[in-house]
Design a protein with these regions (language model features):
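N-terminal leader/targeting and accessory segments in enzymes
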Residues: 1-91, 95, 260, 264-266, ...
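Adenine nucleotide phosphate-binding catalytic loops in nucleotide-utilizing enzymes
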Residues: 2, 6, 43, 69, ...
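Active-site core of PLP-dependent enzymes with the aminotransferase class I/II
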Residues: 8, 220-221
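Short alpha-helical patches at coil-to-helix transitions and adjacent helical residues
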Residues: 10-13, 118, 269-272
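Phosphate-binding loop of NTP-binding sites
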Residues: 19, 23, 57-58, 70, ...
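Short beta-strand "acidic-cap" motif of Rossmann-like dinucleotide-binding folds
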Residues: 26-31, 133-135, 237
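Short, solvent-exposed loop/turn elements at beta->coil junctions and helix N-caps
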Residues: 54, 139, 240-242
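Short, surface-exposed amphipathic charged segments that create phosphate/polyanion-binding patches used
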Residues: 63-68, 104-109, 146-149, 243-256
Length: 297
């Protein structure tokens, strides 16, 4: 498969491009500016670029797909040519969905805590030798395989692209979802609080029938949104667990007694409770979870 990335300099985009390259796909890409670390990575991976800038000659009818970055402008010459040729143009989340549509998609959403929770989940799974695919906002944040059953996706609420302003997390159709928090910020992509909350309502309703959502019941907006949803899914609330503090150390109350943790913030303890629900749905039992969590920093 030949895939061209318009906006390869975006973190999500080059992570996805590298993951596809590792699978043996033919990858090319362009952007106005690449940071120095990315230039080094692209040289090491032999990703096809012509330097910085846009090159409409890269767009031809031999391409199987064009992936469009979230920050690419509507008059981009490569995008214009791809549209003229009638090529298949995908946003990042659309293309990621196509790559993972036969897997069990675990989507972690929320305004501020999704990345931390996704990191916890991936740490727990790796500690317990549970191999999964993933797509998160971090260096080397995308891994795709043919054999893994699960994929963990960090679901952002930013627009998918200039030609499709649907929020990214509407595209994934999760089997298993987590919603951590809803915090509206003035001056963002969404016009007002009501519109912002509506995007999360659509996300909850996009969970496949019979799927599940794990949600933070201590966030009033999240709680009301999830509990009022008529989508026929299972709903698992979580909250800050019971814990003790002694000599600067946090001890979590567990069925097997107090367990020392490396984390200490109440927010992280609450995030841990959500991660536990997700990991249990992915085959990690309570004992395995707590053993791994004791090593998370």
């Amino acid at each position: 498969m030949q895939v061209h990335f318009i906006g390869l300099g975006e973190v999500q985009m080059y992570n996805l491009a590298i993951a596809l390259h590792k699978k043996g796909e033919a990858i090319s890409g362009s952007d106005e500016v690449f940071d120095e670390s990315l230039k080094t990575i692209m040289q090491e991976k032999r990703l096809s670029t012509e330097g910085e800038g846009w090159f409409s000659e890269k767009i031809n009818d031999q391409l199987d797909a064009v992936v469009l970055g979230a920050t690419v402008k509507e008059d981009n010459p490569e995008l214009v040519k791809a549209q003229k040729l009638g090529l298949q143009i995908f946003s990042y989340p659309e293309f990621l969905y196509e790559q993972t549509k036969y897997k069990t998609r675990v989507v972690i959403a929320g305004s501020k805590q999704k990345n931390k929770i996704a990191s916890m989940i991936l740490h727990i799974l790796e500690y317990n030798d549970v191999a999964v695919d993933y797509a998160v906002a971090s260096p080397n944040g995308v891994h795709l395989s043919e054999e893994n059953d699960f994929v963990v996706i960090e679901g952002g609420d930013i627009p998918s692209s200039i030609i499709d302003t649907t929020p990214q997390f509407h595209k994934y159709q999760p089997n298993i979802a987590l919603l951590s928090d809803i915090e509206f910020q003035q001056g963002g992509f969404h016009s007002n609080f009501e519109n912002y909350v509506e995007q999360y309502r659509i996300f909850v309703d996009s969970i496949v029938k019979g799927g599940s959502i794990t949600y933070n019941e201590e966030d009033g907006t999240v709680k009301q949104l999830v509990e009022s949803s008529e989508n026929p899914i299972r709903k698992f609330p979580y909250a800050t667990p019971e814990y003790q503090e002694a000599d600067g150390q946090v001890f979590l109350d567990t069925p097997d007694g107090e367990m020392p943790l490396e984390i200490s913030e109440a927010t992280d303890l609450r995030n841990m409770a959500g991660a536990k629900w997700i990991c249990q749905q992915m085959g990690v039992d309570e004992v395995e979870f707590y053993e791994a969590m004791a090593t998370f920093t």
